[in-house]
Amino acid sequence: NDDGRDAFSKCVTLENVTSDPSMSVQLERPFAQLNIITQDIDDIEANSGTVKVVPDAISVAFTAPTVFNVKTQEASASAAFTSNVAPYYSTVGSQTEHYTLSMDYILASKNQQDIKEVTLTAKKNDSVLNTQTFSNIPLQRNYRTNIKGNLLTTTGVFTVETAPVWTSPENNQIVM
């Protein structure tokens, strides 16, 4: 996914309108944003000698809603989804040691949190370097969820929390 696919919606019902209405309407995203950010690229590059064993492809797999009803603000139906992207298309904040491996917009219903399982696979020259599955990932509409840590070199238990509205500071749970 990319920022070009960002979208906003709102449904307003007007009853018994006898003149031109004048009102302010605040649009909201129908998406949760899922970011997967690694912090171990510098370690990999420093410890891999002349052959750099950093991934050249990332895939992220999860099940996601495929339908969004603007009137009810509900996301429904679902399908398995796998994104295949080149890693490091952006850095996070001003800290260059953090690399965004994937950013996905996922349809979400209003006023509820969806819990997902997300699988990350890092590849180099079509060979799998590392696969990690993250369970119980909370996704909420108009919130950003960051999975952040040494995701390419370690496995373990990850704690992930969501952050309200994308304009506020990120809610990063760092896992080493």
Predicted regions mapped to residue ranges:
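Generic recognition of cysteine residues
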Residues: 11, 143-144
